[in-house]
Amino acid sequence: MRTSPLHPATDSVVFSRPACQSAPTVPQSGFVSELGYGAQQPLLSLLLPPLLRQLGEQSRWQLWITAQHKPSKRWLSACGVPVHKVMQLRRAEAGEAIYAMEQALRSGNYSVVLGWLPPLTAAERLRLNRAAQAGRSIGLLMQPQEGKLAAAAPPQAHAANRGSARYH
């Protein structure tokens, strides 16, 4: 049951900007979030492209810190991401990659920094969060999820897969 009255349709808060005008894309404060990816995570392919496209409207760059993953220019273009604003740092060692992500987030030169990093300690996560807040940037920690899903499978599934391995 609703106890408070509905606001009238002319409420200036609701209609403060035209519907076609996008919301501001500069976060008031930065943050770091973990995103799981893998064959069993199709939702990521629906969420990530619009986010990258919207962040591409900013004057800032997008940085991908990757171990082996290379963003496809064709895929980025098809998603509407401005490829001329995407930079990639490849083959950084784990410690260097964490440090690079921290410095990139803190600089404020990047709207988003995507990092394919090993699992982080609580102290490393805290450092990245503080850096993101200082630079008003978004940090996305990309984590593979296939192993976690297999571990969550019922015991019968593990027994059926005993003795076989799948390599990518």
From Swiss-Prot:
GO biological process: division septum assembly; DNA repair; negative regulation of cell division; SOS response
Post-translational modification: Is rapidly cleaved and degraded by the Lon protease once DNA damage is repaired.
Family to which this protein belongs: Belongs to the SulA family.
Gene: sulA
Entry keyword set: Cell cycle, Cell division, DNA damage, Septation, SOS response
Keyword ATP-binding set for record: no
Designated name of the protein: Cell division inhibitor SulA
Positions of the UniProt region annotated as FtsZ binding: 104-110
